[in-house]
Amino acid sequence: MSDMLPLATYSLNVEPYSPTPALNFKIPVTIRITMAAIDPEPFDDDKKPSTLRIIKRNPELTRGEYYNQDNNDGLEEDESESEQEADVPKRSVKSKKGKAVEQSESEDSEDENEIDDEFEECVLLTLSPKGQYQQALDITIAPEEDVQFVVTGSYTISLTGNYVKHPFDNSSDSDEDEEDYYSDEESSNGEEEEEEEEEDDEELSSGDDDLDDLVDASDIESRLDELVKKDEKKKNNKKDSKRKHEEDEEESAKPAEKKQTTKKDKKAEKVKDSEESKPKPKTKLLEGGIIIEDRVTGKGPHAKKGTRVGMRYVGKLKNGKVFDKNTKGKPFVFKLGQGEVIKGWDIGVAGMAVGGERRIVIPAPYAYGKQALPGIPANSELTFDVKLVSMK
């Protein structure tokens, strides 16, 4: 849909129980409907929700009507000719009258079925001032489509969108380009065929001249053998040159492939070496089962009881769900060891330096215990990835 070019604004008011065509004029233009909204002023006192339906003529049926019309025209011509040739004798009036009544009833039922099959009906949406006021849509209607809208309920529904230009409208240019391409290709193929035919004619004519100069039958046979060998030699030379060319291409491609593979191998080795050279995080088990894992070692003095520290952190549950974080703005500041935070933080942050990064896994008794908080169930083990950014 993004390829369509908007030309102008489209709007249509569909009043209750009044079928309204999507296009009121015969200009061949495509429309794209993107929004439906309800008018809060009711048409009656029932104040029922309004349902928008789209009614579309069945394209298969219209195509069938076209063929049926041609067949009916042919039948009418045959009937007129048969009437001119001879009058049909009258038969039993009673039996004919009964058959006519049955036939008319069956035709009426068939007409009703055809009317039902002629149109396709589909519910698009239902809106009400008490609930939903509007609904986004994305419906494109081509100019050749016979489409109507009808509303059942107590409120008018307004449709809005754009008149758009379809990308396939400029197909004539591409057709001309294709014709030019094929005409050029045919002409080039024709020239190549003519050149090959001229070469063959020259070879045949030269061979004929040589044979005319020979009188003896044995000379002719020997000359024919020479021509055949000469032709085979040419073919073999062509094959050899082609094979040599392919071998040269393969050899030239091999160094490039080797270079690519060596570069990839070197990169993989560097990544592997860098990963292996990285020191593994040090894990320690502290009081109450608290686990700390130093990811980055900071510089300067270590945090201790009474030190005011500024922290960045991301708090996660055991299933990996993030329940709290401080990654930008003002850092979270508290005094270490004074009970301003959960006990797991007072124990887990101690010993860090500025710039240090650490993972702290805190069992439930050293976090919030049996207390349930928003986003944190009771008896939850918490994991914090923390970074010490300031210390006083």
Curated annotation (Swiss-Prot):
Protein family per UniProt: Belongs to the FKBP-type PPIase family. FKBP3/4 subfamily.
Keyword Protein transport: no
Modified residues (Phosphoserine): 80, 82
SUBUNIT field: Binds to histones H3 and H4. Interacts with NOP53.
Function: PPIase that acts as a histone chaperone. Histone proline isomerase that increases the rate of cis-trans isomerization at 'Pro-17' (H3P16), 'Pro-31' (H3P30) and 'Pro-39 (H3P38) on the histone H3 N-terminal tail. H3P16 and H3P30 are the major proline targets with little activity shown against H3P38. H3P38 isomerization influences SET2-mediated H3K36 methylation thereby regulating gene expression.
Keyword Metal-binding on entry: no
Comp. bias (Basic and acidic residues): 220-234, 252-279
UniProtKB keywords: Chaperone, Isomerase, Nucleus, Phosphoprotein, Rotamase
PANTHER family (UniProt xref): 39 KDA FK506-BINDING NUCLEAR PROTEIN (PTHR43811:SF19), FKBP-TYPE PEPTIDYL-PROLYL CIS-TRANS ISOMERASE FKPA (PTHR43811)
One GO MF term: peptidyl-prolyl cis-trans isomerase activity
PROSITE patterns: FKBP_PPIASE
A Gene Ontology cellular-component term: chromatin
EC assignment: 5.2.1.8
SUPFAM superfamilies, alphabetized: FKBP-like (SSF54534)
Bias type Acidic residues, positions: 73-86, 104-116, 172-219
InterPro entries given in the database record: NPL (IPR041232), PPIase_dom_sf (IPR046357), PPIase_FKBP_dom (IPR001179), PPIase_Fpr3/Fpr4-like (IPR023566)
Species name: Saccharomyces cerevisiae (strain ATCC 204508 / S288c)
Pfam families with a match to the protein in the record: FKBP_C, NPL
Further details from the record: Present with 14100 molecules/cell in log phase SD medium.
Region ranges (Disordered): 58-116, 161-284
Residue ranges occupied by any PPIase FKBP-type domain in the UniProt entry: 306-392
The protein's name: FK506-binding protein 4
High-level lineage: Eukaryota, Fungi, Dikarya, Ascomycota, Saccharomycotina
Gene coding for it: FPR4
Cell compartments where the protein resides: Nucleus
GO BP: any one term: maintenance of rDNA
Reactions listed under catalytic activity: [protein]-peptidylproline (omega=180) = [protein]-peptidylproline (omega=0)
